[in-house]
Amino acid sequence: MERFDAIIIGAGAAGMFCSALAGQAGRRVLLIDNGKKPGRKILMSGGGRCNFTNLYVEPGAYLSQNPHFCKSALARFTQWDFIDLVNKHGIAWHEKTLGQLFCDDSAQQIVDMLVDECEKGNVTFRLRSEVLSVAKDETGFTLELNGMTVGCEKLVIATGGLSMPGLGASPFGYKIAEQFGLNVLPTRAGLVPFTLHKPLLEELQVLAGVAVPSVITAENGTVFRENLLFTHRGLSGPAVLQISSYWQPGEFVSINLLPDVDLETFLNEQRNAHPDQSLKNTLAVHLPKRLVERLQQLGQIPDVSLKQLNVRDQQALISTLTDWRVQPNGTEGYRTAEVTLGGVDTNELSSRTMEARKVPGLYFIGEVMDVTGWLGGYNFQWAWSSAWACAQDLIAAKSS
């Protein structure tokens, strides 16, 4: 049986980065993945350009039942540290919006960078490999793979969550946690589009493809200012993806479709200047024409001129456009979700090393645990930071 200092399961962002760091410090590392190629989710991210971090990373941008857990790792390995690595590899990047950093060229550059870093650390890759069983003994862990048995002193689980099953997502990491007696919190899809109840969906389907700036608010008071997109299945766009992580089934969200307009002042000014202008054409100055026309067809916008718009109808219109209350039917689920909420309970782990408190030598990094970031590079930064924190402990174990 071949033995390694550390075996890392999952050749995604966290798994590759942790492997590279430990390998370059002299640890003998085996990196296992069930896919044909490493970094499959990286390649799909950011429209193929990988939103690899965010300039404004802070603990408040992460959801967890233990909101303090992420602070240590994020402080010890920051976005600036990862940007330095990207720069060292000569990868050109740009800020798109709200601090989101993307490769100028392709997400493949980030995968190639991580593979190169792993090669520098003499990391052994074993792809297309299924872990059939994991057992612990006095020397560490023994893993049965399809075709071989391997052993290690330290075992790192970096298998991610349940989002995007088409890219190989599975509950493997949760099962390992449960096998060793660790609590796993209920999971659900996060950063995911909303589906709508049939009557509302049928009313809005003709708007598929229409995008508008918005401010969207969850019942718990969380607010995001981002674009909203109407789709054939419901609502999407950055605003909806962000708020979906804070939404619970049965709840409403409030949507302001005119976040940059004081609608009452605008209507009064336009009435004074153009009293005979139709309300529809007036609103089309700030809203997509297709949206205005559809809302008028649905009776949400009166078919009147500005001088005919009475006070009661104006107030109702303002409420419709700035406090549109929508009760989603649900979400599109893990198939299109960018992340998984919940997972391995962080109270079971050391925030400094990511090691299981009750199982020495067993670590969890990245999305598999109950830490979920906002849209915009935050989840990649958690992968880098948690991987770095874990790697430091793997390195310290070797030196000691």
How would you label these PLM feature ranges?
Residues R49-E95:
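Glycine-rich active-site loop/strand segments that organize a redox cofactor
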Residues R76-K154:
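Feature captures the FAD/FMN-dependent oxidoreductase FAD-binding
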Residues I7-I9, V131, V150-G166, A177-E178, ...:
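Short hydrophobic core segments
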Residues L127, E293-T372:
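A glycine-rich dinucleotide-binding beta-alpha-beta segment and adjacent secondary-structure elements
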Residues K36-P38, L43-M44, F52-P59, A92, ...:
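An anion/pyrophosphate-binding glycine-rich loop and adjacent beta-alpha core
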Residues K154-L200:
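Glycine-rich loop(s) and the adjacent beta-strand/alpha-helix scaffold that form part
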Residues E2-A14:
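Beta1/beta-strand and adjacent pyrophosphate-binding region of the FAD-binding site
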Residues I7, G23-G47:
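Glycine-rich FAD pyrophosphate-binding loop
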